[in-house]
């Protein structure tokens, strides 16, 4: 065995408390995976998500369970049959990509046969707070091209968006309910959000309880997040509504694995 896998926990304080509909946090707990092969070292990290039943301990155990196979040469393709989509597989998969890039001198995007790298516009997220606090945060980030606004369904969401729109009138806006609304809230807010220039609503209803959206009006484009956790989710999503866009996050193998 020439390869060796290690994993360690790191905690990074956030600049402030970050709130969504499910809770709040003031730090990010990550697991860092390193795969050593001779002088080469590939590394990656992941964030376990309680929403999917993950903890730091459970994800660490998943990673260490495949450590012997990785040491014996387990590759990215075979990894998909050894770990389910999730934080653990994401970290090991990305570490293997990084290791191969360093060993061959070929960037990961070349290995993946992506035609070319082009700049992409991403969103800047504002966590849930009072309308006044979110408006101040929006004003401080008014030059960013797209602001994503976390929502809760607590009755103050429309006030939050109105205050943000007034503070950052040039910014494009999307909102993310993180499963925090019900159908009545969606039907009430969607047309009003459209009037405020909101271009997309992400995951308004809970995953597994979003069928009512299939026949609901669409004044704003909808985006699936928690309802589209892996590739197996796509057929059901398409069957519900061909106009719903799946979201892609930075942890690709946790979202689009088999």
Residue ranges of each PLM-predicted region?
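N-terminal capping/lid subdomain adjacent to the active-site entrance of alpha/beta enzymes
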Residues: 1-173, 178-187, 191-195
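Catalytic core of soluble alpha/beta enzymes
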Residues: 149-258
């Amino acid at each position: 065995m020439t390869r060796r896998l290690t994993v360690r926990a790191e905690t990074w304080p956030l600049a402030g408390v970050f709130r969504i509909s499910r809770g709040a946090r003031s730090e990010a707990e990550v697991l860092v995976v390193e795969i050593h092969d001779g002088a080469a070292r590939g590394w990656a990290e992941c964030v376990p998500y309680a929403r999917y039943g993950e903890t730091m301990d459970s994800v660490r155990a998943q990673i260490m369970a495949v450590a012997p196979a990785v040491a014996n040469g387990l590759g990215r393709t075979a990894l998909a049959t050894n770990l389910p989509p999730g934080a653990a597989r994401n970290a090991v998969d990305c570490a293997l990509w990084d290791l191969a890039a360093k060993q061959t001198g070929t960037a990961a995007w070349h290995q993946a046969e992506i035609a070319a790298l082009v700049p992409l516009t991403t969103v800047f997220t504002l966590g849930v707070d009072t309308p006044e606090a979110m408006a101040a945060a929006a004003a401080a980030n008014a030059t960013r091209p797209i602001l994503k606004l976390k929502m809760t369904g607590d009755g103050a969401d429309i006030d939050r968006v109105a205050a943000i729109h007034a503070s950052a009138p040039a910014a494009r806006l999307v909102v993310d309910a993180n499963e925090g609304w019900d159908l009545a809230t969606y039907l009430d807010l969607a047309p009003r959000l459209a009037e405020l220039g909101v271009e997309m609503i992400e995951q308004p209803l809970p995953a597994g309880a979003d069928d009512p959206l299939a026949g609901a009006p669409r004044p704003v484009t909808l985006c699936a997040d928690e309802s589209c956790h892996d590739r197996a989710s796509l057929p059901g999503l398409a069957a519900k509504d061909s106009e719903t866009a799946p979201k892609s996050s930075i942890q690709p193998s946790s979202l689009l694995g088999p």
